[in-house]
Amino acid sequence: MITFKPTRDADLVEAVGNHPDIIAGSNNGDGYDYKPDTKYFEVHVHGEFGGIVYYHETQPLTFDCHAMYLPHARGFSKDIGLAFWRHIIATTNFACVISYAARKFRHGQIYCAMIGLNRVGTIKKYFKGVDDVTFYSATREELIDFLQKHSRS
């Protein structure tokens, strides 16, 4: 069972975001700072804390979504991502979600596609004038359709 618990615990969010395994896959390697205007959720998988998922409303009804999974929870990443889509579909009125992954972070790119996001394109030298970043998005309707096609019976 996967559950999401809203959190405003900045220390917890930063501890996860600055975990060496999280930083290794981050876009710029600088670590993570808590952002007060972001909605954070603790992820629990079968009762065990597995990381943080979050979104920030970049435009009205557009959520920039990201995940920070601890190593022991990564085997559940697809299930967590799909459950998070179900959660925000049920609890918000978003119209579109976006995300991005550094070109060097192939796992992040694969993950975005695996949970139903569509590749939009790549912006060269997006991070610090060095790293290229690939952007992904999906509308609410596209995610609902994806979830219907990829639900377990």
Model-derived features: positions:
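Short amphipathic alpha-helix that is part of the acyltransferase structural core
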Residues: 1-28
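Conserved N-terminal entry element of GNAT/NAT acetyltransferase domains
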Residues: 1-8, 141-153
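Active-site rim helix/loop that mediates acceptor-substrate recognition in acyltransferases
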Residues: 23-41
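Conserved beta-hairpin
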Residues: 38-51
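Conserved acetyl-CoA binding element of GNAT-fold acetyltransferases
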Residues: 60-72, 100
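Conserved acetyl-CoA-binding loop-helix of GNAT-fold acetyltransferases
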Residues: 74-90, 114
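Conserved beta-strand-loop-alpha-helix junction that forms the acyl-donor binding cleft
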Residues: 98-110, 126-127
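Conserved catalytic-core motifs of GNAT/GCN5-like acyltransferases
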Residues: 100, 118-134
